[in-house]
């Protein structure tokens, strides 16, 4: 997210605590917060999808649900054509 938008979120938050927000500012704050949260969720999802779990013997123990997502995206050499990947 653009640093200017994050600064605006913080500015509106501070103003809300001190003098309060106008109706327009409340709408702007809600929109900016939703945009920030969506970006955060996208980032976490991308990070989790890139994880491959391996046990002490080196065996892939990644949960099947995560493996399926990785197959769909072609991550970690996984492929929809190879159900064992």
UniProtKB/Swiss-Prot annotation:
Belongs to the UPF0291 family. The keyword Cytoplasm applies. It is found in: Cytoplasm. Pfam families: DUF896. It comes from Streptococcus agalactiae serotype V (strain ATCC BAA-611 / 2603 V/R). One of its GO terms (cellular component) is cytoplasm. This is UPF0291 protein SAG0271. Residues 62-85 have a biased composition (Basic and acidic residues). Its main location: cytoplasm. InterPro entries: DUF896. Keywords: Cytoplasm. The keyword Amino-acid biosynthesis does not apply. Residues 58-85 are annotated as: Disordered.
